[in-house]
Regions:
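A structural signal for multi-pass alpha-helical bundles of membrane permease subunits
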Residues: 5-258
């Protein structure tokens, strides 16, 4: 049985890793080789028939990371740093707020708790594109356009509903007896929450953080519409969209090495 399990895991790992391996190999190709019909899976400088293209390893795509764009004067690392800052801070804020809210819904008697939870979840029903214009007008009045803070607040608000529901499920699974024992020993409610619930909910917080980070990292519409006329807070998805809009075609090696 162990051999069968190992074989199944090996097949699964191979299938899961194949796209990543191919993307890494594409990053070592030239633009012509990336779209050539006759290519080799393993990079090699060996000669191929004259009617085919030569497949050679190159670091041209990697060197493009440090080159500022002629249109914006910014390199890829600028957009990567923006994504890291905005994604990480919005994720931390979402998880912290959601954990506190989920603890309240899980441990206290709140009038209309089910209705409040449904209302929180219902904020996910509305497509984000439906509120781009009103949020843009509001952000202009608050002077939050072209800022990291504006996107952090927005992503935190959008991720909060999913985060609350996820964290409530994890906190519901933590036995109340642990907190009650801590309260009997003289712990305050906050101390019991901090010392008892948080350590046991770390797994749930990590899972919630992954979902929030993925959502913030991949968001495109607000990252573009709230950063018009400035590159200060634009993120990686906006950078990728600009690459795809080039008239010379999509530079697949440059896209792959990111």
């Amino acid at each position: 049985m162990s051999v069968l399990r190992f074989a199944i895991l090996l097949i699964y790992f191979t299938l899961a890793a194949l796209p990543l391996v191919w993307m890494g190999l594409t990053a070592l190709k030239t633009n012509d080789d990336a779209i050539a019909r006759n290519v080799k899976f393993i990079p090699s400088a060996a000669a191929v028939p004259t009617d085919s293209r030569r497949f050679e390893m190159t670091t041209q795509a990697w060197s493009n990371l440090q080159k500022p764009s002629p249109l914006t004067g910014r390199s890829f690392y600028h957009y990567l740093l923006n994504s890291v800052i905005i994604g990480s801070l919005s994720t931390i804020a979402s998880v912290c707020l959601a954990t506190c809210a989920a603890y309240g819904f899980s441990r206290f008697r709140i009038a209309g708790a089910k209705d409040w939870l449904f209302f929180i979840l219902s904020t996910r029903f509305l497509p984000p594109l439906a509120v781009v214009v009103p949020i843009l007008l509001m952000y202009r009045e608050l002077d939050l356009t072209n800022t990291h803070l504006g996107l952090i607040i927005l992503y935190t608000a959008f991720n909060l509903s999913l985060a609350v529901w996820l964290m409530k499920g994890f906190i519901d699974d933590i036995p109340r007896a642990f907190e009650e024992a801590a309260l009997v020993d003289g712990y305050s409610r906050f101390s019991a929450f901090w010392r008892i619930n948080i350590p046991q909910a770390l797994t749930g917080m990590a899972v919630t953080a992954v979902f929030c980070l993925i959502s913030s990292w991949n968001e495109y519409a607000f990252a573009l519409s709230l950063n018009q006329g400035s590159e200060a807070a634009k993120t990686v998805p906006v950078y990728f969209a600009r690459l795809q809009g080039q008239t010379t075609g999509i530079p697949w090696p440059t896209v792959a090495d990111r």
